[in-house]
């Protein structure tokens, strides 16, 4: 009996769904709780004002509900068991949204310097004696003591920051892919991004819905996003 009482009877009874969201689901074709149960997360996310985060919450509340015996009989008449078996056998994987394989337009010299930067191991430049005292952080500070072995450059005492460790000027500060990073907070920030040489990095404070809009707009403009959202998609069998 407790399971029956926990089962949402109306769309507005679902966790995270109010009257306005229920109307949006109904307009998208999900007029009952059964329709929501049969839908995928991606299908629910396409409804106006739902998004991936709320779609996942809805599926968590509705997707695991047990189906009554009468409903099973009706589904068997329609042939729904075959569809359920098919859904259970579908393989999925996480894939990044957007143009993840896009590379920048670099000159031969920039490509050579970028490869050189990858092959050179830069020291960590830890603070002197950081491993001896717990209160000493690893952040770099130049040793100033007259007897400091690190200041005198004694082997094994750690490297000191010098100009010779800097990366080549042409590729300094660039992403490992070769793009110049541009921090964006909304779709308007993408207006000044050059898709051939620059890539967007979405700010960490941006929410899921706005992030999705930014990623869609960036893909339409041919701009690569360096920190894309990973979504679950079905794996197509090419055999």
Curated annotation (Swiss-Prot):
Acidic residues biased stretches:
1-12, 67-91
Q: Which UniProt keywords apply?
A: Ribonucleoprotein, Ribosomal protein
Gene Ontology annotations of biological process type? DNA repair; translation
Q: Which Pfam families match?
A: HHH_5, Ribosomal_L32e
Query: Which superkingdom does the taxonomy of this entry point to?
Result: Archaea
Q: Which InterPro entries match?
A: DNA_repair_Rad51/TF_NusA_a-hlx (IPR010995), Hlx-hairpin-Hlx_DNA-bd_motif (IPR003583), Ribosomal_eL32 (IPR001515), Ribosomal_eL32_arc (IPR023654), Ribosomal_eL32_CS (IPR018263), Ribosomal_eL32_sf (IPR036351)
The molecular function GO annotations come to: DNA binding; nucleotide binding; structural constituent of ribosome
Q: Enumerate the residue ranges of region (Disordered).
A: 1-23, 64-178
Biased composition regions of type Basic residues, renumbered to the chain:
130-155
**A single Gene Ontology CC term:** cytosolic large ribosomal subunit
Membrane-crossing residue ranges in chain numbering: none
Ranges of Basic and acidic residues composition bias in the record: 92-113
Would the keyword Protein transport be found if you checked this record's keyword annotation? Answer: no
> NCBIfam families attached here?
PRK08562.1, PRK12766.1
Q: Which PANTHER family match?
A: 60S RIBOSOMAL PROTEIN L32 AND DNA-DIRECTED RNA POLYMERASE II, SUBUNIT N, RIBOSOMAL PROTEIN L32
UniProt family annotation: Belongs to the eukaryotic ribosomal protein eL32 family.
Q: What is this protein called?
A: Large ribosomal subunit protein eL32
What is the gene called?
rpl32e
């Amino acid at each position: 009996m407790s399971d029956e009482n926990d089962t949402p009877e109306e769309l507005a009874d679902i966790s995270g769904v109010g009257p306005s969201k229920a109307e949006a689901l109904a307009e998208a074709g999900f007029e009952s709780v059964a329709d929501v149960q049969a839908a995928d997360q991606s299908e629910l996310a396409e409804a106006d004002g739902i998004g991936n985060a709320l779609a996942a919450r809805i599926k968590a509340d509705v997707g695991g509900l047990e189906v009554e015996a009468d409903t099973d009989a009706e589904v068997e008449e329609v042939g729904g068991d075959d569809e359920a078996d098919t859904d259970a056998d579908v393989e999925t994987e996480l894939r990044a949204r957007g143009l993840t394989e896009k590379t920048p337009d670099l000159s031969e010299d920039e490509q050579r310097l970028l490869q050189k930067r990858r092959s050179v191991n830069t020291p960590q430049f830890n603070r002197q004696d950081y491993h001896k005292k717990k209160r000493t952080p690893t952040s770099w500070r130049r040793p100033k003591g007259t007897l400091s072995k690190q200041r005198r450059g004694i082997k094994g005492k750690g490297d000191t920051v010098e100009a010779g460790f800097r990366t080549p000027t042409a590729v300094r500060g660039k992403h490992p892919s070769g793009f110049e990073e541009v921090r964006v907070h909304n779709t308007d920030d993408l207006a000044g991004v050059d898709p051939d040489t620059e890539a967007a990095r979405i700010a960490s404070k941006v929410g899921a819905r706005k992030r999705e809009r930014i990623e869609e707009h960036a893909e339409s403009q041919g701009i690569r996003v360096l920190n894309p959202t990973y979504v679950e998609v079905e794996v197509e069998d090419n055999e």
